Amino acid sequence: MGAVRFANNTICSEHYIPYLSQMSCVLTAALINLENGKMDVCHVGDTRLYSLRKDVFTKITSDHSIVGPKEESGQISEEEAMVHPSRNIITRSIGKEMLYDGSEFIQTHTLHLEPCTLLLCSDGLYDMVHSSQMKRILQGPIPADERVEKLIDAALEAGGKDNVTVIVIDLMK
């Protein structure tokens, strides 16, 4: 959490420079500790962390966006969220305001590790590729780097114009 607060405050300290005055970014980070079997997740914005465990594909983070809470509460479907005109309007980001504590602003989780596949991704992926297709690709019997390529290809083939950031991590016991 301290590193995220430091990054946030460093970005904020550059706002006096006119061309940097609107600078901010989103962040999802996972710190995996194999010694204690836990993973700490730190999240601000609309990048996502998913877990695929025993055929169950779960979104771990909650989007800090206009549309995210509507999708999570069931007010709109995943399909509706993918094309919603406000889908890319974020409500929290790194670099918008100075943080002195940040514990309420930054979403954190501690998860107990089990064999699973983790997917960290930007909206360039999940705005274009349905979660069921992401799950199918992640379940493929190919190395993680090839699954990354397949996910990126799926987003681009669906007409993706945004940047597509994808990280796949296989955790095995």
Where are these regions (language model features)?
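PP2C/PPM-type serine/threonine phosphatase catalytic domain
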Residues: 1-173
